[in-house]
Every structure is written in C-alpha cells, then in structure tokens.
Amino acid sequence: MQHRPHLLLISLTIMSVCGGSNGLTDQLNNKNLTMPLLPIEFHKENTVTNDWIPEGEEDDDYLDLEKLLSEDDDYIDIIDAVSPTDSEASAGNILQLFQGKSRIQRLNILNAKFAFSLYRALKDQANAFDNIFIAPVGISTAMGMISLGLKGETHEQVHSVLHFRDFVNASSKYEILTIHNLFRKLTHRLFRRNFGYTLRSVNDLYVQKQFPIREDFKAKVREYYFAEAQAADFSDPAFISKANNHILKVTKGLIKEALENVDPATQMMILNCIYFKGTWVNKFPVEMTHNHNFRLNEREVVKVSMMQTKGNFLAANDQELACDVLQLEYVGGISMLIVVPHKLSGMKTLEAQLTPQVVERWQKSMTNRTREVLLPKFKLEKNYNLVEALKSMGVTELFDKNGNMSGISDQGITMDLFKHQGTITVNEEGTQAAAVTTVGFMPLSTQVRFTVDRPFLFLVYEHRTSCLLFMGKVANPVRS
C-alpha cells in the first residue's frame, strides 16, 4: 500500500478596499453577507488583531509599542563587510540600499526585491493582457513562518529566494533570528489603529487533530508571527465553513468562499489575511468621473470610468526606463505609485528592470507640482497558487516529498498548495488595498496633466517602514 504524504497548505487572503466607501457600504448591508459569530474554540488569542473593536471606539494605540520597541531595536547599524561568497554586484547594491536605513526598512527592501522577482514569475505564467495583483508583505510573512521549520537545502533555498542570507551577511550584528524578530516588529508597526487608514492582518495556524507538530516550532510562530496552533479536522466540511466565515469577518464581508475545498490529507494550514482601506489626500470628485478611452494595445481601445482631480502631486519622468511616475497619497503615510510607460511596448522593459533601486531612484527624483490627474477606476480580484512561480525562482525542495521540514514535525510532511487570493478596489474616495542622482530624470514641469490611459503598474508603500504592501499591473481596467 503506497503511503500518502502529509500535506501542508498555505493560504493568503488579501482585501484592499482602496478608500471606497461607495460599494463597500452596499456590500456590508447586503443581507446575504451575514457574518455569524465564531465559536470560541475556532479562533483563540492568536493574532494581534483578534478582537475587532467597532469603528470609532478604537484606542489611539492598542499596542504598547514602548515595551515592544526598545531603543536599540531600530538604530542605524554600521554595515560590515559582506561575505566574500556574495557577488560583488549584489553586495554593492545591498550595501548601497542599506545605507541610512533602519533594520525594518532594510528587511523591507529585500522583501520588495523578492516581490518583484515573484511578480515577474507570475507575469511569465500569465497572458500579456492579464491584470496582476499580489500582497508582498503577506507572502513574505507566510514564507518567514514556514522557514522556521525548514532544515538543510530546503531552508537554504527559501532563505536565498527571500534574500534573508543577504540581510544576515550585511552585518556581523545580524543573524537569522534577527529577521524573524523584525517581522514581529513590522507587524506591530504596520497594523495599528487611528493612522487615518485601516490596515489589519491575521495569521492563523491550523493543525490536523492528532498530527504531531514540534513544540519549538509552535512556540516560534507564536512568538514571532502571533500564530497560535489550533486543532482542526480538515475532512469535516464544517471546517471550511468556519474558516470562510472567519475570512469574511476579517475582510469586512468582501471576500467570500476563500476556501472551496481542502485535501483530506492536509495536516497543517497557514492562513494569512490582510485588509486595507485608505482614503486619498486629494480625492477625485465623483462628478468629474467620465468615460474615457484606455488603450489596451496598438489596436484595441476600451471605454473606462476615468476619475479626474487637480492638486499637488509628486511625480517624475524616468528617461532611462521611458516611463512617468506619479505618487498618490493616502491619509496616514501610505501612498500608491502609478508607473506608466511612455509607449505601450515599454511595459516589458519596465517589468524586467523593476528593482528596489529603481523605486528609490523614482522617489528621490520626484518634484511636487500642481497637476491634473486622470486615473481609471478599477477593481482586481486575483487567485493564485504560487507553487510553480516559486519553483521557477529556485524554491523546489519545499514542494518535493523529500523536502526537509523536520523542524515542523518528526513525521514526513510536504506542501502542494500555496494559495494567494486578493481583491483591490480603487475609486474616487481612495483604495478599499542605482546611485541617487538626477541624471536621466527631469521634473514634470511642463506637463500639467498626468493621464493614465494605457496599461500601468501600481505599488502601495507604507513610508515609515518602507514596506511594499501591494503591487500589481492594470492591463485592462474593465476586467478583474
């Protein structure tokens, strides 16, 4: 009789309602979207956002950051020489980007580097005209959790792709646990209340009843990622219903049926949920929204709902990559970068060369001027199994029956699903999701109008931590 391997499943659910109260209220008032209360045993004290306080009743800061962030936790280290095993080019870029950055910012630089590579892997698997949407911080967090239980070559592959090894090699003061501690700090920095936006995250760890998980693994994911191991029966249809109700609650009723079915052989599931709602600093007047042409390619044009506003916006023109960059700010220190190639054919080059260095170059070369901005409304709903994309990036043993996950369980365990699901809505109210030099750049001094009428990239950053929250491509605004 052939032995069937134990399965590990990772599921990430992302909801980004970019500022839009329109549509959100309607959906929340929909009687078909009732959110039944969850039994106590289903969701224990396992996340920093477990207890949802009604809007308007939040404390100014529901976390005691003074205890969590000691004075020396986020200081600027002197960068030591990197390991000679690193390539000179890679080491130089890492050192250059790390200069003047806090530890959390350095971690997020490498998280973004991983995200851009993952984006390219997903793009290579998709149709050229497909929209793309991912939440890098959720993916990095889930992989960070799993890496706590990996050993040998399996561990090395994951750490290499996530660039954790580059981080450790950058300073003699850094070690692997430094990274996990920074993920803990990052969670507390990001998911706070009353910053003018809503950003929530939940990490859940479900374990099949009677399946033995190492106590040290459970302790570490609890300490660094706030995930308390919870017993579950994956063969019971009631589990899927309960999990979906939980996701429905976390995402304010906007993501339904996230889990359609679970393989009965699954022994462990990691569920990461992120919800974001932000409001533009410069809103788009609803009465200004109008039908406008959007060029899909050299031959096809579609009509889109084009929003329009006027105000002071940061923007730059990158002559090297032949694109325009606009920063749209949300209330509270989060912003969306809109990147539009000059030519329709320029998207491939832009996607291929997108790096943290390029983004930093854009941000440091922007000028603040009064501009008229035209941006299409869009809503993206994407669902990915990231396994093949991660394999193409070099993470192969994690999804192989011979992968070493002995730090999770003494019994054999393998992973065959890494689910990533997200939704982002952008409307008039907001969203409801190289060397520093001016060479090759020029201010948009003569361009009074910034019109987004062709496929574009978007990147959502939290500025204090330099965290890339969301990114994607809008190839066709009328499709999800």
From Swiss-Prot:
Gene Ontology biological process terms, A to Z: blood coagulation
Region (2 X 11 AA approximate repeats, Asp/Glu-rich (acidic) (hirudin-like)): 56-80
Matches recorded under Pfam families: Serpin (PF00079)
Glycosylation sites recorded in the entry for this protein: N32, N169, N368, N404
Signal peptide: 1-19
Site (Reactive bond): L444, S445
SUPFAM superfamilies assigned: Serpins
Cross-referenced SMART domains: SERPIN
Keyword rRNA-binding: no
Family named by the database record: Belongs to the serpin family.
Domains (record comment): The N-terminal acidic repeat region mediates, in part, the glycosaminoglycan-accelerated thrombin inhibition.
The protein's name in its UniProt record: Heparin cofactor 2
Record lineage: Eukaryota, Metazoa, Chordata, Craniata, Vertebrata
